[in-house]
Amino acid sequence: MLLGLTGTRFGVHFVTKAQRAKVKEAMTFTGIADKAHYRLSELSGGLRQRVAIAQALVCDPKLLMLDEPLANLDLASQRAVVHVLARLNKELGMTIQVVAHDLNMLLPILTGAVYLLDGHPHYAAMNDVLDSKLLTHLYGTKVQVVTTPQGDMFVTPTPDEADDIVPDTHDTSEVAQFHHHEYHERKGRAQ
């Protein structure tokens, strides 16, 4: 946890009582306080991810930026990390930016998305992004947005028929329809 306070793990560091309390608070918040005496190498990927979040928390950030925070984690670990992120936002009012290719576990806590379309960034609310046609274009493969009877949503690839495989969905005419939110404007008028 010293890395979060000092920026380095090596050398002699004098840690104040207040800093120790902040570390304990961050570890408790992320659910890793009981692992304080373990070496990082002894922890699972999910616990390591929560250690990294706790390290960031000791500095009282207003913004937390994460790159693929759920990558290579089992479902239980993904859920635990998402739970911590949701609490950070709801209880501490922290803004969280996440780079992720697989959105499914994050969908319940996402409010918007910045996505790259033909090399240009665009922002949209999640309701606008969760569109099969747009996501098919962004992922470069056919996908569908599925809503469960409980109201949960997830994005999944559409099984392709052998002669229905789309080799490249990024042709110029298709890209043009999504630029400048033209797609979202047309979608709004059609409803």
Question: What is each residue range found by the language model?
Answer:
Residues 2, 16-35, 41:
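Conserved ABC ATPase "signature" region
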Residues 138-191:
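ABC ATPase nucleotide-binding domains
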Residues 64-68:
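Catalytic Walker B motif of ABC-type/P-loop ATPase nucleotide-binding domains
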Residues 60:
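Conserved catalytic motifs of ABC-family nucleotide-binding domains
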Residues 39-43, 47:
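Conserved ABC ATPase signature
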Residues 100-101:
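H-loop/switch region of ABC-family ATPase nucleotide-binding domains
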Residues 112-126:
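H-loop (His-switch) and adjacent beta-strand-loop-beta switch element
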